[in-house]
């Protein structure tokens, strides 16, 4: 009954997009939660798209360590390397930026509500396959945006980052550190 429906709503947005309910019946809050679940995909080694659960765990652990004023983020008795934190932050920022930018382009191009467009872009970048039913009516620009997001979501953020930066040469010297106030 309802327990199976709840499990389905938690698992479906993070995997293959098999759908058992009409998503257009979701409230705005339900759509927002589904968007978040589509962006946070499965674990490493799985075929699920989206941000890996370990990426989110690294970011949450780092945030908690920052709030507690700890020098390093620790998880399961191990220190998380700064490069891992940088990669997690970069990939997460890329996913969120692409999803929001794509949603904005589609919303402006089609005159549709932003939340509806974000639902479609999160599904594309997370390679989930869920839809609110607007995709067949989209113009060429909007469909092209979704195709590019699907490609990014399938190939993966880190792969594209390394491919784009592989020709960059490493600098031998290091610049001095600067303390920047963030808030």
Model-derived segments and spans:
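Membrane-proximal intracellular helices of multi-pass ion channels
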Residues: 2-183
